């Protein structure tokens, strides 16, 4: 499977360690093509340019709400149907936004901390399994 055939995942987070971890889990281990975006300055246009099959967005991006980016992504025709995983350690906020999640649609929650199996199983369910690269 070539890079262009692997499912593409764009990850937005303001924590470089988290981005490195997600790249290790999803690209190096699971075989997805991963694009990393460092936080609050990320725009929906940048995400759309990466042509993702899946978005993973943290809810708190350096003081800016990740919800804003989710809403902007949904308003962009190129991202309107792309599934989104929102990540947060703030379980209370996730519960408060349940109605909004349902209204926006195709939004999935990943509570921090999460295990490697949790994230890979959710990603597989949403975009399919990547074929592990050899060599």
Per-segment meaning from a language model:
Residues 68, 91-110, 117, 121:
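Alpha4 helix (beta4-alpha4-beta5 surface) of REC/receiver domains from two-component response regulators
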Residues 16-35, 104:
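Two-component/phosphorelay signaling modules centered on CheY-like receiver
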Residues 50-57, 61:
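Active-site beta3 strand of CheY-like receiver
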Residues 36, 61-64:
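Residue-level signal for the "D+5" position in two-component response regulator receiver
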Residues 51, 78-83:
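His-Asp phosphorelay/catalytic-motif detector in bacterial-type signaling
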Residues 87-89:
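Hydrophobic/aromatic residues positioned on beta-strands within the core alpha/beta folds
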Residues 1-10, 14-16, 115-135:
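Non-catalytic signal-transmission and effector/linker regions of two-component phosphorelay proteins
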Residues 39, 65-71:
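Acidic catalytic/metal-coordinating carboxylates
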């Amino acid at each position: 499977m070539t890079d262009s055939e692997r499912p593409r995942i764009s990850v937005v987070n303001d924590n470089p360690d988290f981005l490195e971890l997600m790249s290790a889990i999803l690209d190096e281990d699971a075989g997805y093509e991963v694009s990393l975006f460092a936080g609050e300055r990320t725009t929906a246009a940048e995400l759309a340019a990466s042509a993702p099959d899946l978005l993973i967005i943290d809810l708190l991006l350096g003081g800016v709400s990740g919800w804003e980016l989710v809403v902007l992504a949904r308003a962009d025709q190129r991202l309107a149907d792309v599934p989104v995983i929102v990540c947060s350690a703030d379980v209370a906020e996730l519960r408060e936004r349940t109605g909004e999640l349902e209204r926006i649609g195709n939004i999935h929650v990943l509570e921090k901390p999460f295990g490697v199996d949790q994230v890979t199983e959710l990603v597989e369910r949403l975009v399919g399994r990547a074929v592990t690269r050899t060599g």
